[in-house]
């Protein structure tokens, strides 16, 4: 299992475009991929769950990944977040 913390830098917070791209990448993964925010969890495979948190600029969240090719999925998700200036590198 991999768990990593990120801080939102986008002034709009976790908005629809990056959330949909993260969901698209996560759906391809056969294992468990969850976003943890303020003690709550949502599957990264559900855009509704992610958007429901309303994560704002400056707030942090964790990604928790468990299954085959965890490191590759983390890399893919980080590329999406970095390319869209969603989180700090």
Say what each PLM segment does.
Residues 54-89:
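C-terminal structural segments of small proteins and small subunits
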């Amino acid at each position: 299992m991999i768990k990593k913390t990120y801080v939102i830098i986008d002034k709009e917070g976790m908005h629809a475009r990056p959330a949909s791209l993260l969901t698209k990448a996560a759906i391809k993964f056969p294992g468990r991929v969850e976003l943890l925010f303020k003690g709550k969890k949502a599957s990264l495979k559900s855009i509704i769950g992610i958007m429901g948190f309303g994560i704002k600029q400056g707030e942090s969240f964790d990604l928790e990944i468990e299954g085959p090719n965890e490191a590759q999925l983390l890399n893919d998700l980080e590329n999406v977040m970095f390319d869209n200036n969603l989180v700090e590198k």
